[in-house]
Amino acid sequence: MARVKRAVNAHKKRRTVLERAKGYRGQRSRLYRKAKEQLLHSFNYNYRDRKARKGDFRKLWIQRINIAVRNEGITYNRFIQGLRLAGIELDRRALAELAVNDPDTFKTIVEQAKAALPEDVNAPVNA
């Protein structure tokens, strides 16, 4: 069997790992073994945080909407209930954007949601 010389491939592999680890602190950017291990962790963190980012943004939108509707004298869950009853199908992202950048339009949406709510808080919604 012929001998396989891997020097070129090995150097290329190590160089790419060290290039990807550029910017890490200490040995993690200079030593191949440490850099490789850190890259594996980094890929896992990256994957996990890409999933978590979606929930983080949803929480942020809910907080922004909650602050804006409380200034109008209604709670967040009553506002969402009013939107459903009024047939307004705006997602939380759009509502948060309106609350921050266009308060007048958001105020009219809140008024429509308030109008759609039943007067009695404990009244059944379907009645």
From Swiss-Prot:
The keyword Glycoprotein does not apply. The keyword Transferase does not apply. Keywords: Ribonucleoprotein, Ribosomal protein, RNA-binding, rRNA-binding. It holds the Pfam family Ribosomal_L20. Gene3D superfamilies: 6.10.160.10, Ribosomal protein L20. GO terms for biological process: ribosomal large subunit assembly; translation. One of its GO terms (molecular function) is rRNA binding. One of its GO terms (cellular component) is ribonucleoprotein complex. InterPro entries: Ribosomal_bL20, RIBOSOMAL_L20_CS, Ribosomal_protein_bL20_C. Belongs to the bacterial ribosomal protein bL20 family. Binds directly to 23S ribosomal RNA and is necessary for the in vitro assembly process of the 50S ribosomal subunit. It is not involved in the protein synthesizing functions of that subunit. This is Large ribosomal subunit protein bL20. The gene is rplT.
